[in-house]
Amino acid sequence: MKLLAVTVLLLVICSLEGAFVRRQAEEPNLQSLVSQYFQTVTDYGKDLMEKAKGPELQAQAKAYFEKTQEQLTPLVKKAGTDLLNFLSNFMDLKTQPATQ
């Protein structure tokens, strides 16, 4: 019986000490994680700026914007015309009851 009690006591002490050691283990510092994240973002931004300095990327971007502008200009003009027609219909509806 004493042997069983001593065994249980040793197991409890070992498990408690193991939990104590786990609590003392160093947790990753939030500040270091955030600074590491910002450093990674900064490095990525620098790499991106170096790549953007190349003339071929600038030419591709310019061509893309010109193509987009060519495609969007007619759509914007049509949307403006449709909006004016829509608003003029509202103005016509408001003036009709007054004339009757």
Swiss-Prot record:
Single GO cellular component term: spherical high-density lipoprotein particle
> Which terms in the Gene Ontology molecular function aspect does this entry carry?
apolipoprotein receptor binding; cholesterol binding; cholesterol transfer activity; enzyme binding; heat shock protein binding; high-density lipoprotein particle binding; high-density lipoprotein particle receptor binding; lipase inhibitor activity
Q: How would you summarize where this protein is expressed among tissues?
A: Plasma.
What does the protein in this record do? May stabilize HDL (high density lipoprotein) structure by its association with lipids, and affect the HDL metabolism.
Indicate where this protein is primarily found. secreted
Keyword check for GTP-binding: no
**Encoding gene, per UniProt annotation:** APOA2
Residues bearing Methionine sulfoxide are M49
Any one Gene Ontology biological process term? diacylglycerol catabolic process
| UniProt keyword annotations, A-Z | Cleavage on pair of basic residues, HDL, Lipid transport, Oxidation, Secreted, Signal, Transport
The similarity annotation says: Belongs to the apolipoprotein A2 family.
What name goes with this protein? Apolipoprotein A-II
**Sorted alphabetically, which InterPro entries does this protein's record hold?**
ApoA-II (IPR006801), ApoA-II_sf (IPR036172)
Q: How does it assemble?
A: Monomer. Interacts with NAXE and NDRG1.
Q: Spell out the PANTHER family in the cross-references.
A: APOLIPOPROTEIN A-II (PTHR11027:SF0)
Signal peptide boundaries? 1-18
According to its UniProt record, where is this protein located?
Secreted
